[in-house]
Amino acid sequence: MDEDINKDTNNNNNTTDSNNNNNNINEDEIIFNNYINNYSNYLNNNGISALDLLIQGRDGNNNIITFCSEIDQMLNGGTPLKKITEICGVPGIGKTNMAFQLLVNTSIPFDLGGVQGKAIYIDTEGSYSCQRVREMATHLVNHLECVLLKNPMTQTTYIPTVETVLNSIYYYRVYHYIEIISLIHQLPLFLEKNKDVKLIVVDSITYPFRCDFKDMGLRTRSLLSLAQNLMNIATRYNLAVVVMNQVTTKISPNQKESILVPYLGESWTHICTYRMVLFWKQKQRFCHLYKSPSFKSCFTPFDIVEYGIRDVGFNHPPPLNPEDQEQEKEKEKRKKKNNNNNNNNNNNNNNNNNNNNNNNNNNNNNNNNKNNDENEMYIEN
């Protein structure tokens, strides 16, 4: 009797396994068929040539600068659009400050080398500081006004205010990896209505995935799906994606030393287009361009000061109060007026000189005519 029960149980288990296998096969067939159909649709559309891609790269929008010229130079002009850039480092090194600087710099006008757009900040750790962002926005506006005062010939029709900069930043707070996956999945609906968004910052990508996953394969699949969606969004909507990553300790095989490596493992390493590692060296902050498809690996120092990310030793002009701004504008007006008056006086002098020259020429012509008449009279006599 027991043997019959065991046989029935084994048969049921085998039937269940067979059903599961059949379900898996059916799911695989559905996925395969969908992929084949989508691939056929891709082939039906006209492709794009390498020359067109090159022209698009040359004629594309400006990069998002960091206000550290050495870092911008490493990236050939700043944080690139249509790419995923990862910034990783130990706590307190300046990752969040770098994120805040990129957020406010997204508002820089086209005429001054910016992208003149808006930004999305996805906060997973509660790191956002309204006061710090407002401080950076104030110094950004002051910097742009100083640039215009020093270069009055600069042609621009738009200078943002502090309120405009802050109003251009959309903030989202998430607490769980399912929330961030859902948010990224729904972002295209938001971006269709807000096509001037040029930056998405995730600070940090690490925190939602540091919880203990019972299935590490699930974590890897979730990360890959999230990264794929971010890459599609960056390419489709012509914007930059910047993700912050923490570091963890890795023990060497011989168990004699340990090193700090970016979190999330090797699979995540191949996802990002650029990787910048921030680190300390002799009490100085450094930025190391660790991974890049087109630039060599290099590093440069940078500072975090009251007004944001800057070059080491950079002297920022003092902020202008409203009275100083009015005085500077009046000086510029007087200078332009004096230049115009001088130009008018020079033109008048030139006209007078031309008139004098014309009079002299007329006198010379009259004298020549008189001499000719006298000579003719002499010949006749």
Curated annotation (Swiss-Prot):
Domain of life: Eukaryota
Keyword Isomerase assigned: no
CDD domains: Rad51C (cd19492)
SUPFAM superfamilies (alphabetical): P-loop containing nucleoside triphosphate hydrolases
Compartmental location: Nucleus
GO BP terms: meiotic DNA recombinase assembly; reciprocal meiotic recombination
Pfam families attached to this UniProt entry: Rad51
Keywords: ATP-binding, Coiled coil, DNA damage, DNA recombination, DNA repair, DNA-binding, Nucleotide-binding, Nucleus
Low complexity bias locations: 8-24, 339-370
InterPro entries reported for this sequence: DNA_recomb/repair_Rad51_C, HR_Repair_Mediator, P-loop_NTPase, RecA_ATP-bd
GO cellular component, one term: replication fork
UniProt keyword Nucleus, yes or no: yes
Coiled coil (UniProt feature): 323-377
Annotated ATP binding sites: 89-96
GO MF annotation, one: ATP binding
Annotated region (Disordered), positions in chain: 1-24, 313-381
PANTHER family linked: DNA REPAIR PROTEIN RAD51 HOMOLOG 3 (PTHR46239:SF1), DNA REPAIR PROTEIN RAD51 HOMOLOG 3 RAD51C (PTHR46239)
Family indicated by similarity: Belongs to the RecA family. RAD51 subfamily.
Function: Involved in the homologous recombination repair (HRR) pathway of double-stranded DNA breaks arising during DNA replication or induced by DNA-damaging agents.
Name of the protein in its database record: DNA repair protein RAD51 homolog 3
